């Protein structure tokens, strides 16, 4: 049976939309929003009608008959911690997305816009594996300071999608596998997947774990505290150093990993050291995840935009291939991942979860 799905992925300055017929993409557009357009709105939620109307106008301009859709799926936002899966949008979810219970982010609009369009055409709206997916074991939450428990905020959508892709290609069930997934993009997350649950992962949103093109990664605690109280920086400036101006940005003034790689290949010693240091830290986190899984690892997956860079994947593979075979799925196809999650529900493979 064929299903037509509208997928919606709101970002800070753009909204990506795509239409799928099962897993085949038949329409894709990135709708850019100028800062001038967005300045008219006091907060993220106020952009809702503007973004929705823009989506409907583009679909009309493309002569797509939206009445033919079977479901609408939006990118999941900063909700309360939930287990992974596909969730049907309900009133409780809409309330929490509007309130920004874990912070304001453009992705909070995904479920809201999806629900509004779905209601107008008499179909259901869903979200799939938002960044707040939390399946961590209790032992993984300890940090060493009770007031600072470790949190699970990471690239859940792509982590789950590539792990399930590997399972499908291996003709095995995701729930029967132990997989380590290293997502490397603007941020880095390394997740230990055990029998269908991500039982330990770094908080990529706050820059925990390996450093990345724009995030600092783990820092020397004492030195960080002294920096905070040096009088040189405000709280916002310190937070920016950790997420936004850390990593490659701090060392080389760019968040483009390819620029750093090319400089390294051209003989720039500092660029080579920084580039390798990121790979070193990712490999170290993969080793830690292997310990979490008691050394029983079926596969290590390298994914995200930086997984296109052979210099990086080769460096990491050399260090961790003794643990398990390496599979590389470069990039992240978020729109397809949203569609696949919804298809699993519509086809009866999975049951939609209820947000509470």
Swiss-Prot record:
**EC number(s) given by UniProt:** 2.7.2.7
- What's a GO cellular component annotated to this UniProt protein? cytoplasm
Q: In its keyword annotation, does this UniProt entry include ATP-binding?
A: yes
First-level EC class: transferase
What is catalyzed by this enzyme?
A: butanoate + ATP = butanoyl phosphate + ADP
What biological-process terms (Gene Ontology) are attached?
A: acetate metabolic process; butyrate metabolic process
Compartment list = Cytoplasm
Name a Pfam family for this protein.
Answer: Acetate_kinase
Alphabetized, the UniProt keywords read: ATP-binding, Cytoplasm, Kinase, Nucleotide-binding, Transferase
Q: Which GO terms describe its molecular function?
A: acetate kinase activity; ATP binding; butyrate kinase activity
**The protein's annotated pathway:** Lipid metabolism; butanoate metabolism
Decide whether keyword Transferase is in the record: yes
Subunit and partners: Homodimer.
UniProt family annotation: Belongs to the acetokinase family.
Q: What is the purpose of this protein?
A: Catalyzes the conversion of butyryl-CoA through butyryl phosphate to butyrate.
What name has this protein been given in UniProt? Butyrate kinase 2
The source organism is Clostridium acetobutylicum (strain ATCC 824 / DSM 792 / JCM 1419 / IAM 19013 / LMG 5710 / NBRC 13948 / NRRL B-527 / VKM B-1787 / 2291 / W)
